[in-house]
Amino acid sequence: MAVQQNKKSPSKRGMHRSHDFLVNPSTAIEPTTGETHLRHHISPNGFYRGRKVLKTKADE
Protein backbone atom coordinates (compact mmCIF):
# COMPACT_ATOMS: atom_id res chain seq x y z
CA MET A 1 0.00 0.00 0.00
CA ALA A 2 1.32 3.46 -0.88
CA VAL A 3 2.27 5.75 1.99
CA GLN A 4 3.03 9.43 1.47
CA GLN A 5 6.55 10.59 2.33
CA ASN A 6 5.65 14.24 2.99
CA LYS A 7 2.35 15.94 3.73
CA LYS A 8 0.95 17.97 0.84
CA SER A 9 0.04 21.50 1.95
CA PRO A 10 -3.44 22.89 1.23
CA SER A 11 -1.93 25.21 -1.37
CA LYS A 12 -0.20 22.37 -3.24
CA ARG A 13 -3.34 20.24 -2.94
CA GLY A 14 -5.35 23.03 -4.56
CA MET A 15 -2.80 23.42 -7.35
CA HIS A 16 -2.91 19.67 -7.97
CA ARG A 17 -6.72 19.77 -8.31
CA SER A 18 -6.86 22.97 -10.36
CA HIS A 19 -7.60 21.13 -13.63
CA ASP A 20 -10.26 18.75 -12.29
CA PHE A 21 -13.20 21.04 -13.08
CA LEU A 22 -15.89 20.22 -15.65
CA VAL A 23 -16.29 22.26 -18.82
CA ASN A 24 -19.47 22.62 -20.85
CA PRO A 25 -19.08 21.41 -24.44
CA SER A 26 -18.92 24.20 -26.98
CA THR A 27 -21.99 24.48 -29.18
CA ALA A 28 -22.67 26.07 -32.55
CA ILE A 29 -25.79 27.52 -34.14
CA GLU A 30 -26.85 26.14 -37.52
CA PRO A 31 -27.20 29.14 -39.87
CA THR A 32 -30.09 27.71 -41.92
CA THR A 33 -32.32 26.42 -39.11
CA GLY A 34 -31.05 28.34 -36.08
CA GLU A 35 -30.74 25.16 -33.99
CA THR A 36 -27.88 24.62 -31.57
CA HIS A 37 -25.71 21.52 -31.90
CA LEU A 38 -22.28 20.28 -30.89
CA ARG A 39 -19.49 21.75 -32.97
CA HIS A 40 -18.37 19.52 -35.88
CA HIS A 41 -21.56 17.44 -35.54
CA ILE A 42 -24.72 17.27 -37.62
CA SER A 43 -27.71 19.20 -36.25
CA PRO A 44 -30.87 17.23 -35.34
CA ASN A 45 -32.48 18.36 -38.61
CA GLY A 46 -29.69 16.75 -40.67
CA PHE A 47 -27.87 19.97 -41.61
CA TYR A 48 -24.12 20.52 -41.45
CA ARG A 49 -22.55 23.89 -42.32
CA GLY A 50 -25.69 25.05 -44.11
CA ARG A 51 -26.14 21.95 -46.28
CA LYS A 52 -28.61 19.07 -45.89
CA VAL A 53 -26.41 15.97 -45.45
CA LEU A 54 -28.79 13.48 -43.85
CA LYS A 55 -32.39 12.50 -44.48
CA THR A 56 -34.59 12.65 -41.41
CA LYS A 57 -38.02 11.19 -40.70
CA ALA A 58 -39.54 14.66 -40.98
CA ASP A 59 -38.40 14.84 -44.63
CA GLU A 60 -40.42 11.79 -45.64
Swiss-Prot record:
Polar residues bias: start-end ranges: 24-35
A GO term for molecular function: structural constituent of ribosome
Annotated organism of origin: Bordetella petrii (strain ATCC BAA-461 / DSM 12804 / CCUG 43448)
GO terms under cellular component: large ribosomal subunit
PANTHER family cross-referenced by the UniProt entry: 50S RIBOSOMAL PROTEIN L32, LARGE RIBOSOMAL SUBUNIT PROTEIN BL32
UniProt cross-references to InterPro entries, sorted A to Z: Ribosomal_bL32, Ribosomal_bL32_bact, Ribosomal_zn-bd
Superkingdom in the source lineage: Bacteria
Keyword entries, A-Z: Ribonucleoprotein, Ribosomal protein
Protein name per its UniProtKB record: Large ribosomal subunit protein bL32
Listed GO biological process terms: translation
Compositional bias (Basic residues): 49-60
A Pfam family the protein falls into: Ribosomal_L32p
Protein family: Belongs to the bacterial ribosomal protein bL32 family.
Region (Disordered): 1-60
